[in-house]
Amino acid sequence: MFRSSFDKNLENATSHLRLEPDWPSILLICDEINQKDVTPKNAFAAIKKKMNSPNPHSSCYSLLVLESIVKNCGAPVHEEVFTKENCEMFSSFLESTPHENVRQKMLELVQTWAYAFRSSDKYQAIKDTMTILKAKGHTFPELREADAMFTADTAPNWADGRVCHRCRVEFTFTNRKHHCRNCGQVFCGQCTAKQCPLPKYGIEKEVRVCDGCFAALQRPTSGSGGAKSGPRPADSELPAEYLNSTLAQQVQTPARKTEQELKEEEELQLALALSQSEAEQQKPKLQSLPPAAYRMQQRSPSPEAPPEPKEYHQQPEEATNPELAKYLNRSYWEQRKISESSSMASPSAPSPMPPTPQPQQIMPLQVKSADEVQIDEFAANMRTQVEIFVNRMKSNSSRGRSISNDSSVQTLFMTLTSLHSQQLSYIKEMDDKRMWYEQLQDKLTQIKDSRAALDQLRQEHVEKLRRIAEEQERQRQMQMAQKLDIMRKKKQEYLQYQRQLALQRIQEQEREMQLRQEQQKAQYLMGQSAPPFPYMPPSAVPQHGSPSHQLNNVYNPYAAGVPGYLPQGPAPAPNGHGQFQAIPPGMYNPAIQQPMPPNLQPGGLMQQPAPPGNPQMMPPMPENQFANNPAAILQLPQQHSIAQPPQIPFQPQPQQIPGQQPQQIPGQQPQQIPGQQPQQIPGQQPQQIPVQQPQPQPQMGHVMLQQHQAPPAAQAPPVTEIANNQVQAVAAAPAPPQNEPGPAPVKAEEPATAELISFD
């Protein structure tokens, strides 16, 4: 059924009926490859067939066998497995296999091999394969460095040569060449006549080795027993079975001392050696210590002999000498000495030395936890056991005794074995703690990065808020600047308006002053007023060419319809207001001139006779009355239906601001509506001249209707122009003639003026 033992072992190792790997069969496969019973090429071909099995368990076990031969069979298998074709086969196998556990195992193997041969250019194909698989998106498991450790020793490759490597005899047809399995060199038949197993290469059966390698391999066992007896020439004549047996390896000479004596001597030498080494190490430290600590160190008890070896097996932790462990735990005692020296040097004043110091009361600087104390005790105990074991082995080697017969060595070995398992548990626990602390450190790093990112975001947010605040402040300043500009413009307009009002007020005051000066000048020129002249018939004075007519033409330039006269009716005041400008008594005011009746219009002056029945109303006036008193022209009687308006002294006109109601001058009465009783001027008698009622004219009736319908609003003519005209008229007027016709009556439509306001 099976062609060879390799096929049988491979079938057992890759059977799908197994629940766990068959490690004995796997190790036998490795031994067969190392012993050259199977070539690496054939072995790898058989394993590839098992890898392509449809059963996932068989495929997984075949990968486990492949991993074992790669780790244990050395360079020949490496050169066979890590070729370019086989690496491409691994990639295709990963793509084609439907089983997840097989795929993960293959990825783990590729990663382990790539890491193990990362520094070797000879196996570049497996590293390229891993790179390609990563590029394709395959996820590799976590790498464990322990899986990538290839520490197994492999047999060297066979060298080739034409002569023997030892005796230099040339190989011929009859003198065949042979290779030593231990060193790999080529030898003749006589130089490779011996055989022995090679456990370090995984070769359990006896194989051909050269004489030099055989002597080197047999020297540790034969040299320990025959170191003092010397080499025996008869050993070569003994059979190989006897030489390989345990009897030949034992000491053949009788022991000079008993086992108990040797044990006691060995323990004594061990204690002396430990004491000497401890003293040598503590000597430089004791020189630096203060005298008190040195004396306390001298009072420490001396070490005692260790207990019997038989107690090691029963109580492994209590087998060590506590005093010896105290000496071996140097770090603890050094720390105690440092603490003692620091406690002694801390007080400023020297304190007296107590007679009996108690070192056990002095606590170390750092208080250790219970787990740390337990681990320290275990480490000290194991260190002591290892040193005792090493010293025992050295003692046996120096005395030439067999180790197999020493029960103390065996007991120490069993004790160290039990301590080793406990040490592994402690190591695992420490590794777990280390990983936990590393995770904490990673989390702290993440927290630190997160805090840095948060601080950066906070800074950006603060910067953003600052920019927003600056933008708002800039907009607020712009708005304030615009408002300030608008307010400045309004202020300038208001100041300009106030300036105009002030200038206008000053102009009005100047006009008033000029008007007053002109009035005073006119009054001064006119002199005192004369009594009114009597009524003159129209026939007594010629109509045209008389001096009075010329005087009227010169002196009355405001009469309507006459050349040189201004239009009738009140003119608007130059200041834009409709208030009445008062004229002092005795001054002719053309603004209140009434329309002349038909008998007094130009061309018909003094043509109508006096009304009969009232001759006494107008006494006769001398003809030269106008010549002596030119102001008498202004005192002519008006119509009988309209009383002469009183002369109101001039008052300054108040300035009116646009948008406000016109203010009335205090003390000024409103003008009297026609039909009321006229007011008389103080100091002057009203004169009534009987005048015939003129025929009503349509134009006058229309004017009177408008005046009755509208409220009376007295308007003053331009004061400056009136004053200038009056001054020119008075200056250029000739002497009045003797026969002066009657003056033109004032307009009858003039409403009644307000009461006279005195300046007193």
Curated annotation (Swiss-Prot):
UniProt protein name: Hepatocyte growth factor-regulated tyrosine kinase substrate
Originating organism: Drosophila melanogaster (Fruit fly)
GO CC terms in record: cell cortex; early endosome; endosome; perinuclear region of cytoplasm
Subcellular location: Cytoplasm, Cell cortex; Cytoplasm, Perinuclear region
Keywords: Cytoplasm, Developmental protein, Metal-binding, Phosphoprotein, Zinc, Zinc-finger
Annotated stretches, region: Disordered: 275-323, 338-359, 602-626, 644-760
Principal location listed in the UniProt entry: cytoplasm
Compositional bias of kind Low complexity: 653-694, 706-733
UniProt: Zn(2+) 1 binding residues: C164, C167, C188, C191
